[in-house]
Each structure stands twice: as C-alpha cells, then as structure tokens.
A protein has these predicted regions:
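Short hydrophobic/aromatic beta-strand element in the GNAT-like acyltransferase core
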Residues: 23-27, 38, 73, 137-139
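Glycine-rich acetyl-CoA-binding "A-motif" of GNAT/NAT acetyltransferases
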Residues: 31-37, 114
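C-terminal "cap" of GNAT-fold acetyltransferases
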Residues: 57, 109-116, 120-122, 129-156
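Conserved GNAT acetyl-CoA-binding A-motif
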Residues: 68-70, 74, 96-111
Length: 157
C-alpha cells in the first residue's frame, strides 16, 4: 500500500468503527504485548446505515443484510495467522452479536480472495456475488440462530 493510501484505508476500515462502534472492536495482544490483529465490527445493518453508503455493494446485497445484519472487518499480522487468533476474534464478535439478539453476521470479500477459506472455516457461507469497482465480491453470511438437531430415538418398544 502506498503511503498516500494508508489514511483513507484506516478511515474506511477502522475510523468509522472506532468512532461509532468501539464496543465491537476487538484486539488480539500477544504474550509480549504486540498487537497480533483486530476485528472491527458493527451490530447495525449497513444497507440501512448512511455511514456505509460508500460501500456500493450493499445496494446489491441489501436483502441479505436483513438476516445477516452484523458485519466485520478483520486483519491479522501475517506472523500470527494460522494460530486460531482470527477465529477467536470472530467467535468473540459472534457471541456479542448473538447476545444482542442479532440473527447473523456477514463479511464481503473478493470472490477469489485467500480469506474466503478462512471465513468458510468459521461457518460463513457464500450467499451472493456482485460486481463492484471492477472486481467480483462475495457476500458471506453466518447464522447466529441455534441449529436444529434431529433427535432419533434408538429405544425399542
């Protein structure tokens, strides 16, 4: 990333979350007090929130934002990837969203981005794609509703 791109990037992916959703901002700190990564989350539906109007893909994904209203941006220092830290950050945000009564969480990422596999591992499912800024993006949702389990009786009468 070029130096002139850093400030707009920070504002887009961090600034508005810190300013309005600090209670949904999670930081992973290592045993030597180094920041390993963060998750910036929002419990509100971005399709109905003017703060996220610059993310034009929400026009395409608006119907999906109702069952999956909470959204997040996550970033880990590559030295700390593949250690379960990102999954722990997502679990913390999912627990917060569930306790707030929300039905689901989502992310939007590049359709062929390497993080798609990470999200799938964390129970997100690809639900729709759209073209945005010359790239294909995918809306991935994770339900926070309790799963129904089938109960099969093995008793004989």
């Amino acid at each position: 990333m070029r130096p002139d791109e850093r400030q707009p990037f920070k504002e887009r992916w961090l600034g508005r979350y810190i300013a309005y959703d600090i209670e949904s901002f999670f930081v992973a700190i290592t045993e030597v007090s180094t920041v390993a990564g963060y998750l910036a989350g929002c419990l509100d539906n971005p399709a109905h929130n003017p703060r996220f109007a610059d993310n034009g893909y929400y026009a395409s994904f608006a119907p999906l934002c109702d069952p999956y209203p909470c959204h997040l941006h996550i970033n880990l220092d590559e030295r700390y990837r593949n250690r379960g830290i990102g999954s722990a950050l997502i679990a913390a945000f999912a627990a917060q969203a569930a306790s707030a009564g929300r039905s689901g969480i989502h992310v939007v990422t590049g359709e062929r981005a390497r993080n798609v596999r990470f999200y799938e591992k964390n129970e997100f499912r690809p639900l729709a794609t759209a073209r945005w800024n010359g790239a294909d993006v995918v809306f991935m949702g994770r339900s926070l509703r309790p799963r129904r389990r089938s109960v099969i009786s093995t008793e004989r009468t």
